[in-house]
């Protein structure tokens, strides 16, 4: 379980330490990191919005796997479970994933860091639009099972993938709540350049933070790119 993962993380860092002081410092750093994670993890199950966020990230992971991208690189680049601002970071390339209803497509940004390209060579935004369906679709559970199957050839990667799911708050005991079905309608890809409509930290007055806002698709049409461009750059 997630607490075993926490202890394992501490033991691994201690094993890599050369001196007692180094071991103590690393242990304190690990505890601090995990405290922040525990504060954010929803142990009571994922909300609908959290489920949709995870579905979007899983759709992108499957897209990359289906395009023969390195499974190891994909897992290492998946920063969403660490509650970082970007969902994926491949070297200097950041990727933010969004999922919304196909009936009223819009991009919801939850904080000023998500579209901030500081310290990145390039930032992309991918938007998936879905429709609620009764049958012939996929659920969060079925998408996770599909993804696990693709990682099943490597036991270590499969284990790491399951650990990342736990960090996001996905636990087996809540599976019955994750059978809502969706159908993928369309996906959009954008290059988040300097002129892309967004709010970033440097634009905000002192004391203002955690800004949440929506972007209309019509406002970002000129920033559209082909998904192949993203594939080539990561």
What feature does the model see in each segment?
Residues 64, 88-101:
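Conserved catalytic cores of phosphodiester-cleaving nucleases, focusing on short active-site segments
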Residues 1-83, 101-234:
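Nucleic-acid endonuclease domains
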């Amino acid at each position: 379980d997630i607490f075993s993962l926490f202890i394992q993380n501490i033991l691994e860092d201690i094993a890599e330490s050369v001196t007692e002081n180094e071991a103590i410092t690393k242990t304190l750093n690990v505890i601090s990191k995990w405290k922040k994670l525990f504060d954010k993890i929803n142990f009571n199950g994922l909300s609908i919005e959290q489920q949709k966020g995870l579905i979007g990230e899983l759709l992108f992971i499957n897209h990359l796997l289906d395009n023969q991208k390195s499974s190891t690189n994909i897992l290492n680049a998946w920063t969403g479970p660490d509650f970082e601002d970007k969902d994926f970071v491949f070297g200097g390339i950041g990727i933010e994933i969004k999922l919304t209803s196909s009936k009223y497509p819009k991009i919801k940004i939850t904080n000023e860091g998500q579209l901030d390209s500081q310290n990145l060579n390039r930032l992309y935004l991918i938007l998936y639009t879905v429709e609620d369906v009764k049958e012939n679709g996929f659920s969060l559970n079925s998408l996770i099972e599909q993804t696990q199957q693709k990682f099943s050839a490597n036991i270590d990667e499969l284990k790491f993938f399951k650990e990342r799911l736990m960090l996001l708050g996905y636990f087996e005991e809540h599976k019955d709540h994750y059978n809502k079905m969706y159908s993928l309608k369309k996906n959009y890809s954008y290059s988040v350049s300097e002129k892309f409509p967004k709010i970033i930290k440097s634009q905000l007055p002192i004391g203002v933070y955690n800004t949440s806002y929506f972007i209309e698709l019509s406002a970002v049409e000129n920033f559209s790119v082909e998904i192949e461009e993203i594939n080539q750059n990561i």
